Amino acid sequence: MAEEKKLKLSNTVLPSESMKVVAESMGIAQIQEETCQLLTDEVSYRIKEIAQDALKFMHMGKRQKLTTSDIDYALKLKNVEPLYGFHAQEFIPFRFASGGGRELYFYEEKEVDLSDIINTPLPRVPLDVCLKAHWLSIEGCQPAIPENPPPAPKEQQKAEATEPLKSAKPGQEEDGPLKGKGQGAAAADGKGKEKKAPPLLEGAPFRLKPRSIHELSVEQQLYYKEITEACVGSCEAKRAEALQSIATDPGLYQMLPRFSTFISEGVRVNVVQNNLALLIYLMRMVKALMDNPTLYLEKYVHELIPAVMTCIVSRQLCLRPDVDNHWALRDFAARLVAQICKHFSTTTNNIQSRITKTFTKSWVDEKTPWTTRYGSIAGLAELGHDVIKTLILPRLQQEGERIRSVLDGPVLSNIDRIGADHVQSLLLKHCAPVLAKLRPPPDNQDAYRGEFGSLGPLLCSHVVKARAQAALQAQQVNRTTLTITQPRPTLTLSQAPQPGPRTPGLLKVPGSIALPVQTLVSARAAAPPQPSPPPTKFIVMSSSSSASSTQQVLSLSTSAPGSGSTTTSPVTTTVPSVQPIVKLVSTATTAPPSTAPAGPGSVQKYIVVSLPPTGEGKGGPPSHPSPVPPSSSSPSPLGGSALCGGKQETGDSPPPAPGTPKANGSQPTGPSSPQPAL
């Protein structure tokens, strides 16, 4: 049976009727049966031949599925024009459908809700296409610009700075002195023999690279000139652009020696001249260089650290120390020193320990002026909580007595008094957070006074504030908030006062509004001279599901005291299937006495609440609305309003803040109810 089936498949040919159909479509009415049979055999052979060639292409492509491209290649191999049209990269999953005697294959597309398309915000406008030219090479050298890759990566700069012997140097060959030193330094021929000395004198002479002057190109010299002039110039816009270029340009590796020398010499000259502005500009240059991710400043720290520390502990940085704010420069430079210690301090260079020793030595000295004392404390405090705990807290009592002797003693110098005040503020600022972590609550001023002296009460108050601020920040971190950036439309219905019963009104909010805020304001005449009875409070609640919306009709009744008449105003509210925001508006305005009717009236306050469905989008059952409290409970403390009746207002802006006048002139007499957190 298997052999017969294979034989049947191998002799499969097209039916002769198909040839007749093709001939009739071409205008040939009568064709003989023998001719149809010959054409059928020929077409079947050609189709099988093309299929075999296509299978060969499939096998050569190491694929398991035959594609249309294989058929095209087979047709091209036979010099047959291939089929033209659109080709899909993936197989299209067609679905089959039949009905009415017809068979149809179609591509199933995903159904898209029209409301989703309408409510989807428009995408951002794409940027315009622009072309920018830059130099790939100038005289055979690649320029160091942001468009080109950096000439030396940061890892290579670090390797050259920390391990210069391991980096490949030009002029040193494989059989040079480095290789001889590495192989012959620890070589031993046998037991009992002494180690051979390094063959430095026996081998070939050293090939020393001649000292060359590192010259900058004309473009780099021009860039250096423009950058330095802009950084210390008078134009703030150019200075900002220059600092941004220093912080982001990847091609400044060759100009780092010039920049470090410029900063070092600039600080040395301007400290003598007490030029505070230029010192600030130079420190901003240091900050920009440290922010550049492509630069490694290890080889230039020996020039930058003295310049920065000079701006911290210098006795005088400006011409008028009692007026100019040189304290901000000392704080900024202290943060720079802390950043340098964080990035470049190792167990080999001990940068942080040496800087800490310098600051401590200047602070402990009794003859140190208050400006230098402030800078030393700021530099130590910026190094971290461990430094504060170890070096600053044990000396708080002595420093507090020194500060008290200046502030409470006879006035010797206004500069000393200002400096002592700044030192006291600095100590309270940095020590309070550390003490809040070290000491358990509660905080007692007597205990602080006994441990820290005159600074104890002030430290206690600052520690209490630090604890409260930390607790507030923890609450803000743990609280989940939802920020809604879409505009909130407000729909307000105002009715004019009528002597007779009010007519029913219908209020509907369209479902296309994303987050509606519904506000119903009941208008009445001016307040009567006698005190009005407590108003009636109505709460309208509705729940919505993903399939349909829930409508509730609530009759609002107002009755004048002492009369038997009752006014009924049913309001029907349609809530869309989204989560609206609860909005409460209650206003009251006194009309002129000439237009106010004599009869008393009542006031209504409406709260519209819509609860989201429990399993929205997941097929879960909708949530049930909360029970509506009776209208007679919880009288409202807010009054009504006299508005221009018969006008419907719809706005796209958020509702006004409490206490602001509305567009129709009415003002709220009491605070609105707080909006619940979403």
Swiss-Prot record:
There is a cross-link at K196 (Glycyl lysine isopeptide (Lys-Gly) (interchain with G-Cter in SUMO2)). The keyword Ribosomal protein does not apply. The modification Phosphothreonine is found at T120, T248, T660. One of its GO terms (cellular component) is SAGA complex. GO terms for molecular function: aryl hydrocarbon receptor binding; DNA binding; protein heterodimerization activity; RNA polymerase II general transcription initiation factor activity; transcription coactivator activity. Pfam families: TAF, TAF6_C. GO terms for biological process: DNA-templated transcription initiation; mRNA transcription by RNA polymerase II; negative regulation of cell cycle; positive regulation of transcription initiation by RNA polymerase II; regulation of transcription by RNA polymerase II; RNA polymerase II preinitiation complex assembly; transcription initiation at RNA polymerase II promoter. Keywords: Isopeptide bond, Methylation, Nucleus, Phosphoprotein, Transcription, Transcription regulation, Ubl conjugation. The modification Phosphotyrosine is found at Y253. Residues 622-632 have a biased composition (Pro residues). Gene3D superfamilies: Histone, subunit A (1.10.20.10), TAF6, C-terminal HEAT repeat domain (1.25.40.770). CDD domains: HFD_TAF6, TAF6C. Its main location: nucleus. SMART domains: TAF. The keyword Transcription regulation applies. The modification Omega-N-methylarginine is found at R524. Residues 142-201, 524-574, 611-678 are annotated as: Disordered. It comes from the Eukaryota. The modification Phosphoserine is found at S264, S626, S634, S636, S653. It is found in: Nucleus. Residues 542-574, 633-646 have a biased composition (Low complexity). Belongs to the TAF6 family. The TFIID basal transcription factor complex plays a major role in the initiation of RNA polymerase II (Pol II)-dependent transcription. TFIID recognizes and binds promoters with or without a TATA box via its subunit TBP, a TATA-box-binding protein, and promotes assembly of the pre-initiation complex (PIC). The TFIID complex consists of TBP and TBP-associated factors (TAFs), including TAF1, TAF2, TAF3, TAF4, TAF5, TAF6, TAF7, TAF8, TAF9, TAF10, TAF11, TAF12 and TAF13. The TFIID complex structure can be divided into 3 modules TFIID-A, TFIID-B, and TFIID-C. PANTHER family: TRANSCRIPTION INITIATION FACTOR TFIID SUBUNIT 6. This is Transcription initiation factor TFIID subunit 6. It comes from Rattus norvegicus.
